[in-house]
Amino acid sequence: MAENESNVVVDHGQSRLSDLWTKEDYWAIWLGFVILIAGMWLFLANPSPEFAQKVDKANAVMAAEAERAPFKTLAYYKAQDDKGKLKAMDSATGKSIGAFLKAPGGWTSNPLESFVLSKEAAEERNAAAKSKFEAAKAKSDAAFAAAQVAEAAAAEAGFADTALNDAAQGKIAEWRADLAKMKSAEKKVKTKAFNISTSLPMLMVVMGLFFAIGMKFMGHDVPKFLVGFIGVFVVAVIAQMMGHQSTMKYWGIGTEAWAIIIGMLIANTVGTPNFIKPALQVEYYIKTGLVLLGAEVLFDKIIAIGIPGIFVAWVVTPIVLICTFIFGQKILKMPSKTLNMVISADMSVCGTSAAIATAAACRAKKEELTLSIGLSLVFTAIMMIVMPAFIKSVGMPQILGGAWMGGTIDATGAVAAAGAFLGEKALYVAATIKMIQNVLIGVVAFGVAVYWCARVECTSGRSVGWIEIWNRFPKFVLGFLTASIIFSIISGSLGSDMSQIMVNQGVLKGLSSPLRGWFFCLAFTAIGLATNFRELAHYFKGGKPLILYVCGQSFNLVLTLTMAYIMFYIVFPEITAKI
């Protein structure tokens, strides 16, 4: 083989039984499963009996109100909000874990406040935000009073007067919008003192030893890895700090972007120190994080939004991927098929997660993966700000806007942030559609593996066997899918309410999601530290990667919006009405 295999995302090789304990993909699965099992033991083993009692009480109120009125009343929403306050991660154990995994916090002008915030500084922040909170609270209280009057008028008419019902719904909707703003302002007056200067070194040691287990079995030099991991972790912490700076956060330049930027600055100026290089295990970190992501893809949530969401995510996405790849090959004449495929998958499916899976399936070069992820991060930062602003300016319905953003913005976190800017319904629809789209990570990886074996690297006159496809298929995707299936079963058995409390607000947000965030940050840091500008330069010849991304994303925007409108407002308006 002419190419240097160390420059490929996943090396060629035949499958053996020993792969289960000597290969990176399997270790990503085992480590991911260890975290998820630990999460289940910590949060699911002994649920508080108060949860079930409070859920039953809230559901009784909601059922009674749903029968009493043809719309969601104030009492209905109050009960719904009471359920939303129940979180397994609010237990003593959950709070301890959260404190240990805490990343650097937000800051404006003093970066040290990202690590240590004194009681006096916390009180100063609270005092500065108090006036805005009080104004938001007064507005919310006034909106609630107006909604009470409107609902009382509708109730007095026996909820038989359509005009009064509509007026009540309108006032309640205004109250909900003002309440959301008040809650956002309230967070800023509840700032607490913290000090993570001691927990961060401990977290570094624990994470280093955690990944070192796999490194030992894979035949790497563990002491050298651990020494190098210190350097990677320190850069990752700086990236976390920069990503939480208020201005950077506002403009969407998050942790991932800073991890790559800082890493590349080091690599292309003073050079990445040799002692750090053994810890630049990009795929190892990100694949472990992707296994954890699988647990967040729950089938009951997919079913909840119905066929419209599935059409937006599962019909549009493969069309855009295939058309973009063909456009790159036939029109742009992209010299690298692997770069073309990775960019197409990155842009059409779900950003970096799809990029790493696709790069593994088609044996893309690491520089091609870096370039693709870089494009994704830049456009994600732009779209998460521009799209919600545009949607608001043209008066697009929240559900349509949420579906549009969920199907087009690459990163899951950016989708949630953009959806929250529009409102509760937009956030729910956007996040759910992105989650449905995440399921395609495994499907796309398998499809690309088959296509590359059968069409791109095939030998004339020789048929492709399943063994060859299996050898190429990125095995960590099996961990992603297994985690999704297991947690979907657990979630379904608990019921939607208890699943939200114990799984989503327990195992996931209390343990696996924070760790996934750290693992992704480590991976992006390693990408930056391993990237040489000179090696990337020739890929930008003629600007073809940028043109491919812009054209593909433009097609994605048009097709997703069209499909969302047809599915949510023409074919299935009754489902839209229930959201």
Swiss-Prot record:
Sorted UniProt keywords: Cell membrane, Membrane, Transmembrane, Transmembrane helix
Keyword Cell membrane: yes
Pfam families in the record: Cons_hypoth698
Compartments reported by the entry: Cell membrane
Main subcellular localisation: membrane
One Gene Ontology term, aspect cellular component: plasma membrane
Superkingdom assignment: Bacteria
Topology term for the membrane: Multi-pass membrane protein
Residues that span the membrane, as ranges: 26-45, 193-215, 225-243, 250-272, 305-327, 369-391, 430-452, 473-495, 515-533, 546-568
Record PANTHER family: INNER MEMBRANE PROTEIN YEIH-RELATED, UPF0324 MEMBRANE PROTEIN FN0533
Annotated family: Belongs to the UPF0324 family.
Protein name (database record): UPF0324 membrane protein DVU_0943
Organism: Nitratidesulfovibrio vulgaris (strain ATCC 29579 / DSM 644 / CCUG 34227 / NCIMB 8303 / VKM B-1760 / Hildenborough) (Desulfovibrio vulgaris)
